[in-house]
């Protein structure tokens, strides 16, 4: 079979750390394993445009593997072109770069799987870190020191505690709930969540969280909002100028879910105006982010309020070890035709939805 892996280039960093599996050089640790089985293996970072390596190899690819950190956008046009395609694997969590609805509607016998749970702890930790970086005004403080400065007042005037704040999550699934668990130790005033379904009574009581059914009511009550929901048709552009009007003035917003859940220009404008005191996260649209992306340069009135990073929250080394092994497990099941996948990994099975996170059969 022809297996195409779309990963990012790491250069010398791949030699520095052999467990940097998400790069072309280390190829999820499975290139030799695949080739020894006789598969035709293509590993590339070149994924955009008609002349890309991905485009040139998609017509006869049986399997395409990508990551959320350097996503291969599998569009309707590419699906139509990929006549032999049977399996799409996401080495990580998040299949929104694939046109899942089109696969479902087309009747194609294509399965989509991801390595569920491989980076939930990694992302949850990054969420809490980003909150602290924003609320404590860490980035300007660090930049001040690097540049040789020392002005405590300049930093302290825009620095606060997390304790005593109302913190809300949009999405309380595997990642969102782990964020709530970690926030308990900070003694917030209240923890809120917005989701299509309630947590169990036991889960709610464990973290002391309260469900809010209306998203506008949720953001109006929160000092800090964190986005932890999947990207799908219903969540794309969810955080826009209209919703931002309902945020408590001067709130902080953290997004490690997907960049397209927020309208980039609207968020940048809200930070500039002071409606948001700051925005931080690691997800962008598209990825890699263009040099003129508004989130690269956005700032509040103090020149602060920006805690953006490249998309790496779920790509720390521990997570890469987990999603590399999970990808190999999926491939073993596929190649041996056992198809005994972990149920939680299946997004589409033979073109049919097996999860409520992204859509429903058409």
Swiss-Prot record:
Single GO BP term: formate catabolic process
Residues reported to bind NAD(+): 174-175, 195, 230-234, 256, 282, 311-314, 357
Binding site for substrate: 93, 119
Record localization: Cytoplasm
Keywords: Cytoplasm, NAD, Oxidoreductase
CDD domains reported in the protein's UniProt record: FDH
Recorded catalytic activity of this chain's protein: formate + NAD(+) = CO2 + NADH
Name of the protein this chain belongs to: Formate dehydrogenase
Source organism (scientific name): Pichia angusta (Yeast)
């Amino acid at each position: 079979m022809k297996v195409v892996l779309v990963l990012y280039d790491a250069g010398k960093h791949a030699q520095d750390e052999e467990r940097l599996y998400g790069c072309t050089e280390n190829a999820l640790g499975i290139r030799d394993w695949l080739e020894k089985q006789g598969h035709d293996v293509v590993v590339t970072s070149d994924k955009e445009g008609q002349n890309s390596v991905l485009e040139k190899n998609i017509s006869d690819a049986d399997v395409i593997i990508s990551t959320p950190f350097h996503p291969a956008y599998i569009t309707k046009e590419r699906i139509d072109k990929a006549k032999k395609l049977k399996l799409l694997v996401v080495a990580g969590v998040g299949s929104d770069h694939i046109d899942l609805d089109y696969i479902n509607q087309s009747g194609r016998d294509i399965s989509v799987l991801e390595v569920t749970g491989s980076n939930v702890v990694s992302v949850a930790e990054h969420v809490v870190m980003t909150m602290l970086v924003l609320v404590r005004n860490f980035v300007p403080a660090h930049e001040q020191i690097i540049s040789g400065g020392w002005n405590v007042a300049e930093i302290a005037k825009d620095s606060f505690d997390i304790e005593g704040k109302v913190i809300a999550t949009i999405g309380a699934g595997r990642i969102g709930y782990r964020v709530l668990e970690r926030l308990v130790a900070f003694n917030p005033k209240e923890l809120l969540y917005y989701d299509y379904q309630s947590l169990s009574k036991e889960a709610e009581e464990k973290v002391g969280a309260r469900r809010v059914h209306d998203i506008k009511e949720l953001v109006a009550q929160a000092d800090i909002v964190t986005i932890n929901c999947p990207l799908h048709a219903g969540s794309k552009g969810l955080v826009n100028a209209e919703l931002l009007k309902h945020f408590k003035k001067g709130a902080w917003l953290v997004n490690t879910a997907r960049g397209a859940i927020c309208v980039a220009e609207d968020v940048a404008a809200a930070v500039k105006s002071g409606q948001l005191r700051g925005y931080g996260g690691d997800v962008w649209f598209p990825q890699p982010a263009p040099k003129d992306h508004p989130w690269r340069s956005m700032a509040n009135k103090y020149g602060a309020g920006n805690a953006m990073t490249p998309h790496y929250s779920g790509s720390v080394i521990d997570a890469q070890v987990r999603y590399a092994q999970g990808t190999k497990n999926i491939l073993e099941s596929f190649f041996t035709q056992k198809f005994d996948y972990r149920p939680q990994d299946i997004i589409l099975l033979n073109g049919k939805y097996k999860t409520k996170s992204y859509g429903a059969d058409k």
